[in-house]
Design a protein with these regions (language model features):
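Cofactor-cradling patches in redox/metallo enzymes
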Residues: 43-52, 58-59, 65-85, 96-97, ...
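Ser/Thr/Gly-rich flexible loops in soluble cytosolic domains mediating phosphotransfer, phosphorylation
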Residues: 14, 84-111
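Short, Lys/Arg-enriched N-terminal segments with co-localized hydrophobic residues
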Residues: 1-11
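Short, surface-exposed acidic/glycine-rich loop or hinge patches that mediate macromolecular interfaces
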Residues: 22-23, 67-70, 91-92
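Conserved active-site segments centered on acidic
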Residues: 13-52
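Short glycine-rich or small-residue beta-strand-to-loop segments that form or flank ligand, phosphate
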Residues: 14-20, 61-64, 86-89
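Short, well-ordered alpha-helices that flank and scaffold nucleotide-derived cofactor binding pockets
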Residues: 30, 34, 78, 103, ...
């Protein structure tokens, strides 16, 4: 269930990034926030440590996993149920390409 208005447009997109420590992903979060502001996309974007966070009750429209936690994708998908879970590509992660990851989120959510 996405955060969608009656007119069918997104009110605010909630994007969660999960990685091993949360440190490197926090830089990607900042770049994604800047890209969202530049594109006038209302988005709540945050990062958590996938191994130390209970994702059972997370409220997100989409979840992206850093390359270092790809092994946990199936387990995380099972935990979060209907929330779509995607991998951040190695190139986008390595280059901290927030604009590209944001574009992927919008594409996956049909925005």
């Amino acid at each position: 269930v996405y955060n969608v208005s009656q007119e069918g447009s997104f009110l605010m997109i909630k994007i969660l990034l999960c990685c091993a420590s949360g440190m490197s992903t926090s830089l990607l979060v900042e770049k994604m926030k800047r890209a969202a502001a530049k594109q006038n996309v209302e988005a709540e974007i945050w990062a958590v440590n996938a191994e130390n966070t209970d994702l059972k009750d997370v409220e997100a429209d989409i979840i992206f996993l850093g390359p270092q936690v790809r092994y946990a994708k199936d387990e995380i998908q099972e935990t979060v149920g209907s929330i779509p879970v995607y991998m951040i590509g190695m190139k986008d992660y390595g280059m901290m390409n927030g604009e590209s990851v944001l574009e992927q989120a919008l594409e996956y959510l049909g925005k």
